[in-house]
Amino acid sequence: MNLHHLLKARRAAGKPVRVALIGAGKFGSMFLSQVPHTPGLEVPVIVDLDPERAREACRTVGWDAERIAATAFTPDAAKATAGPIEVIVEATGNPAAGIRHARAAIAAGKHIVMVNVEADVLAGPLLAEEAQSAGVVYSLAYGDQPALTAEMVDWARATGFRVVAAGKGTKYLPAYHDVTPADVWSHYGLTADAAQSGGMNPQMFNSFLDGTKSAIEMAAIANACGLDVPSDGLLFPPCGVDDLPHVMRPRDQGGVLERSGVVEVVSSLERDGRPVFRDLRWGVYVVLEAPNDYAADCFKQYGLKTDSSGRYAAMYKPYHLIGLELNISILSAALRREPTGQPADFRGDVAAVAKRDLRAGEMLDGEGGYTVWGKLMPAAASLNAGADAVVTRRAMEQRFGGVAQTKQSD
């Protein structure tokens, strides 16, 4: 609660926090919009495959000509680790590139804030371990839902509550698993032309809709918070904020969860397409359990919504502000040497499920594409099913799963 005070002290001492940004897309641009309004924070290097696009993004978000002229725009990621940079923000969205950039940052003694949740789910526990050995911070990105959820889980546990469930809200119907970039805009109430004029990527937005992004983010939360994942994928139950304590409790207590201590996503739509009352589409939540009758009585006395037993309650944030909130991660790493969420285990994985019959030899086109959607699975189950051909996955299993692997390929 004192980041602003610490930053003011750094500024007064003439030692601003210097950041390099890799990837000036939507998330990165939202972060850049806050930089001129955060005295003591500087971004001297911006890396993007299209430097002119990155420069234009700075103009769009309100940077003046002097600030732009003082910034190095480059396609060379190696420039991010040069000079007096303290924190590197990886916001490319490309998992292979993200892992390379993170390892280079760690090797150079820089803190790394991983906006790239795909890279985090693939190799986050290993990267966090590598960073710790190097004496730097590896952090999830505050403003995105995994870090915000991890914060709520930490709050609940630090105050003595058992976490029953944690996760986020989204717009979901079962039919969305089969949606492709060709028809995604109809589900957002947009025309293709309107989406294009707004710079919206159909495949990226389809990954939000078809369930893939939810699976990836819940895997990140499970790995960071030590929570379990559902044994057969996310349920996406329709649920508003007032019903969280009723719905998000174990089945033997009247809820939908197979057990306590899991991640789950709630839908803002009823299964017939009607909107859920007081939905949590843009927010995050944690459901907690009172440890005793006294705490349960306090829930009631202070107006906390509970289930019928009075023992289960929920806390939530109705919105997340993406890159507008990213400074919290950057300043936490630089000024407190503390992450805003960090993977510590390999508990959740995401498996590709075909959207249609696939031809032999057909190339999968990634999250939000035409061929597959991503399903959340327990990591142990995905590895046992054979999803361990990638070298990084073998390393994850060896380090965090306790199962020795001897072959390098199957």
Could you describe each region identified by the protein language model?
Residues 92, 96-108, 115-146, 151-155:
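Rossmann-fold NAD(P)-binding glycine/threonine-rich loop
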Residues 131, 139-209:
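Rossmann-like NAD(P)H-binding beta-loop-alpha module
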Residues 64-96:
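A structured beta-alpha segment of the ubiquitous adenosine-cofactor-binding alpha/beta core
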Residues 2-10, 187-410:
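C-terminal catalytic/substrate-binding lobe primarily of soluble NAD(P)-dependent oxidoreductases
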Residues 36-40, 59, 63-66, 132-137, ...:
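Generic secondary-structure signature for well-ordered alpha-helical cores
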Residues 1-62:
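N-terminal Rossmann-like dinucleotide-binding module
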Residues 49, 93, 117-120, 143-144, ...:
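Short, ordered loop/turn segments at secondary-structure junctions
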